Amino acid sequence: MSLPKTPSTPLNSTSTSESKKLKVSVAKEGTRGLPELKEKKNMVDRSKLLPTSLQNEFIPKEVLLSLTYAANAGPCPENLLPPKKIKTPKGTLPRLVDHVWHHPVRRNKFKYLIDHPVSLTGAGRDISFLYDVTYAKGQTREKAVCPPHLARSLQSHDGVIVPHKPKTLTDTLIPEEFHIVSSTGVSGLECYDDKYTTLLTDSENRLLLFPSMKPNKRVEVAQLNDVMDTMLERAGVENQEYTGPTKMHKLLHILKKEQTIYNMIFHELIRQVSVDCADRGELLSKVRERYVQMLDQIARQMIDFYKDLVTQRVMDQRILEELYNFKHVIEELTRELCLVRAHDVKLTKETEKAHKDLAQALLNAEKNAKIVEEYHDLYTLQRERMENDMKKLVAERDIWSSATYELALKVIERNRVILARRLYLNEKGWNKYTKHFIILLSNKDTEDLALLQKLTQKWRNLVNKLKQEVEQMEESTSETLKIVKDGLIKWQEFFNEKDILSPNKGNIFNSVLLDFKQWQKILNEKKEEFTGDVLLSKYDTLKIIKHLQENWADIGLGIFNRHKSLEGEMPSERQYMEEIIKNIQKLYKEYEIRINGDNGYSKILPSLISSLDFCSFKLENLEFPDTPLEEWQEIDEKINEMKSHLDILLNLTGIVPQHIDVDSVSVLQAYIFNMIQQWLLKIGNEINNGNIELQHHMDELHISMIQWMVNLLILMIPNFTDQDCLLKLEEESAEKHDIGVARLELDAIELTRKLYQYSSYLSSCCKGMVTAMALSKSTNSHKNATEDLYEVDKLKKECYEWINTCSCLLSNIKGRKITLLTYEEIERLLEEEAVKEFIEPEIDESFKEDEEESKEDRKLQEENKERAEEQPSTSTEKEKLIRFIGEDENVHSKPLFETDVLSSWRESAKQGTLAQKYLEAMAVIEHMQEKLLEVENRARQAEEKFEDAYEKLHHTLIKNKDLEELVMTSRKESKEEKENQDEREVKEEEEQQEEEEVRSAENSSKSPKKGH
C-alpha cells in the first residue's frame, strides 16, 4: 500500500526531516526546548561528515526521533483507511518500521510502548487540574475546583498561566458550573496492518512512528541524561522568571514543566530498556503507571484539602464583609441616633412652647365659656319672652280668625254671597290638580331623560362598533391590496431585469401563475364583502342604529312638546336636535358609501380581477421560448394598469369621493357625540327651568286669585252708615265703591286671561303624557287607568267654573252681563262641553229684546205694588209664596200667583198689534212650559221607580251574598268528601296489594312441598 506524502510536512529526506525536528520547540509539549541545539543548528552542515568529538555533542537520531515524533507527525491520508492492497512508497516515513511491529503477537508484548504516547494537546497525566485561580486583565479571581478526570491543561497567555477553558455561549442562561466540558485525554495509539507494512495513528488520525527497537549504546543513555539535565535546568530558569498571580500558579507551573520532561524521558528510557529486555521494560512501564496513579491520589487528597481551604477562605471573606456591613450599619444607626436626639430636643422645645400656648388658650377658653354662658342665659330669657309674646299673638289671631269666620258666615247668610264659597272651592281644586300635574310632569321628564341618556349611549356604542367593523374590513382590504401590489412590482422587476424569453423560465412562470391565481382568489373574496350576506348584515346593523336613533329622537320630541313656551313656541333645543339629526344623516350616508363600495371599490375591483384573469390566461397559454415580445409587452401594460388601479384603491381606503360633501368619519362622529352630550345637558337644564317656571306661575296665580276673591268680598258687603253721617262721606264711599268695582273688573279680565292661558298650556302639555299612561295601564289591566285623564278634565272644569263664577259675581255687581271668555276660548278650553254650558246664555241673548220691551210693564207693576203697600191692608189672608234657586245659587222666593209677565203680550195679541215673531215666541214658550210640566212628572215617576228598583237590587245583592256563602261552604264540604274518598281508595289499594303479596308468598312456599 502506497502512502502519499502529506502536503504540510514533506518527509522525503533525512536532512529535511532533521532540520524540521530541530526547528520544532519542545514548548509544544510544555517546555522551551534546548537553546544550545538551536544555536548550533545553523552552524552545522549535515551533508558532510562531522568529527567524532562533535558527533558526541549531538542527540542520537533514534533518541531525537522518539522525543520529537509527536510534534512532527502529519495527518494520516484518508486513502489509508480502510487499508488497500497498495505498497507504501518509500520516503513517506523518516525511517523504516522495525520488523517486530509487523507481527501482532510480538507487537502485543511491546504494547506498553504505544499505550502512553506523548501528547501535545495538554492532556498529559499531570496534576494541573488543581489550578483553580484565573488571572485575567490584572484581576485575580477564584474558580471552583475541577475534578481530575476533566484533565484541564495549562496554557500560557502573556506570561500568565491560566487554565484552558472550553468555548461556551456567552448569552446562555445555564450557569457556568452546569456546562459540559469534554476532553479526550491521552488515548493509546492504534495499529493498522497493511499487506506490506503496519501504520501507527493516534486519536487525531496523525501518522506516527513506531518506537525504534534497535540496540542502544551507553552513549545514548549518557546523552539522554544530559538532555534531561539541560531541560530541567532550562525549566528551572523559566520558573524563576515566571511570576504568577498566586503561589498555586507557580507550583503548578513547575509541576507541569517537570512532569512533561519526566514523561518524555520515561518514555525513551522504557524504550531503551525494552530493546535489551522486554520484561524489564514492561515492569518499568508498570512502575510508571503506579507512579502516575499515586500522584493522582495525592492530587485528589489535595483537592479535598484545597476545597476546605477555599471554603474557609470564602467564609472568612463573607464574615469580613458582614463585619464591614455591620460596622457601616452601626455608623448609620449612630448618625441616625444623633439626628433623632437633635429632633427630640427640638420637639421637646416645641412641646413646651405648645404646652404654654395651650395653657394660655385654656384660660382664654374659660373666659370665653363664661361669656358664652352669660349670652346663653340672655338668649334663653329673650327666647322665653318672645315665645310668650308669640303665644299671645297666636291666641289673639285664633280669636280674631274665629270671630272673623263667624262674622263672615253671618255676612254671607245675610247678603247671600254663596258664590264666593264656590269661587274659593274652585280655586282650591284648581291648585290641587295643578300641583299634581306639575309633579307628574317632572317625574315623567326625569324618566324620559334617563331613558334618553341610556338610548343615546347604546346608540353611540353601536356606532362605534360599526365603525370598528368597517375599519377592520378596510384595513384587511388595504393589506391585501398592498400584498398584491408588492407581488406585481416584484415580478415586474424580475421580468425587466432578466431575459424573460430564455428557455429556463418555465418553472418561474409556473410560480408567477400560482401567485396570480392566488391574488385573483383573494380579491374575489374581498369583492364578496361588498355584496351578498356581508353587505346585508352591515345594512341590518345600520337599520338597527337608525331605528334606535329614531326612538331617542321621538323621546326628545315628546319632552319638547311638553315644554313649549306659554306662547306655544318650541324650545331652542329642538333646532339643536334637528342639526344633530342632519349630521347623523350625513354620517349614515358616508357609512353606506363605505359599506357598499360606492367610493370606488365596487367599480375598480371587478376590473382589477378581470385584468388578473387576463394575465393568468396569457401566462397559461405561453410557449417557451417561442413567445413573441408583443405578448410580453401586453402583459407588462396590464401589470402597470393593475398597479394604477391598486394605487387608486389604496388612496380610497377610509374616505369617500371628493365630490360628495361629507366630512371625515372620525371627525364627524366625534363632533356628533359631543353635540349629543351638550344636547342632553341642555335638555336637563330646560326640564329643571321649565318645572321651576311652572311652579312659579302657579304660585303667582294662586296668590292673585285669593287676593281677587278677598277684594270681591270687601266690595260685595254693603257699607252701613249712620243717620248722622255726612253726605260728603256717603258720596266719597260711593265713589270708592265704583273705583273698586272697575279695578276689580280689570283685575278679573287680566287674571282670567292668565288663568286660561296657563290652564290650556298645562293641559296641552299633560294630555299626550296622560293618554299614553292610561293606555299602558289599561293594557296591564290596572285599576283606575283613566283616572289621570279625568283629572285633566277636572282641571279644565275647575278653571272654567272659577272664571264663570267670577263673571256671574261681576255681572251681579255691575248690573249687566259680563263675559270674561269668548265662545271660541271656552270651546278650546273645554272642547265638547262648551256647547252644553252655553245653552242657557244663548237663550238669554234671544230674549234680551223682550226684556227691554217688558221693562216698562215691570215699572208699572212696581208702582202699583208701592201704592198697595202704602194703603193699609184689611185682608187677613196670607199671600202664597214659592221658593226657587237663582243664578247665584241663593234661595229666592216669589208669589205663587204672580202677575203674568206676558199679559201685555196677550192683550196686544188679542188686539192684533203684536208682531209675528213675538206670537211665535209666545207659542214656543207655552209649548215649552207644557213639555216642562210633563218632563217634571215623568222625572218624579222615574225617581220613584228608581227608588223601588234600588231597594229590590239591594235585597237581591244581600241574597246573592248569602247564596255565595252557601255555595262556598258546600264546595268545601264536597272537596273534603272527595279527599276522604281518595284516601280510602288509596288505603284499600294498599291493603289489596299486601294481600296479593301474602298470597303469592304462600303459593311459593307450597310449591316446593309439592315437589317433595
UniProtKB/Swiss-Prot annotation:
Outcome recorded upon mutating I593R: Found in non-obstructive azoospermia in one patient; uncertain significance
Region (Disordered): 1-34, 841-879, 963-1012
Residue ranges, compositional bias (Acidic residues): 841-854, 988-997
Residue ranges that the Swiss-Prot or TrEMBL entry lists as coiled coil: 317-402, 447-486, 572-597
Localization, UniProt: Cytoplasm
Effect of T134I: Found in non-obstructive azoospermia in one patient; uncertain significance
Compositionally biased spans, kind Low complexity: 1-17
Known outcome of mutating I925T: Found in non-obstructive azoospermia in one patient; uncertain significance
Resulting phenotype, R828Q: Found in non-obstructive azoospermia in one patient; uncertain significance
Known outcome of mutating I270T: Found in non-obstructive azoospermia in one patient; uncertain significance
Record note on what altering H328Q does: Found in non-obstructive azoospermia in one patient; uncertain significance
Composition skew (Basic and acidic residues), residue ranges: 855-879, 963-987
Superkingdom of origin organism: Eukaryota
Keyword entries, A-Z: Coiled coil, Cytoplasm, Differentiation, Disease variant, Spermatogenesis
Any single Gene Ontology cellular-component annotation: cytosol
One GO-annotated biological process of the protein: spermatogenesis
Tissue expression profile of the protein: Highly expressed in testis. Highly expressed in the round and late spermatids.
Cited function: May be essential for spermiogenesis and male fertility probably by regulating the manchette dynamics, spermatid head shaping and sperm flagellum assembly.
Illness association: Defects in this gene may be a cause of male infertility.
UniProt protein name: Axonemal dynein light chain domain-containing protein 1
Protein encoded by which gene: AXDND1
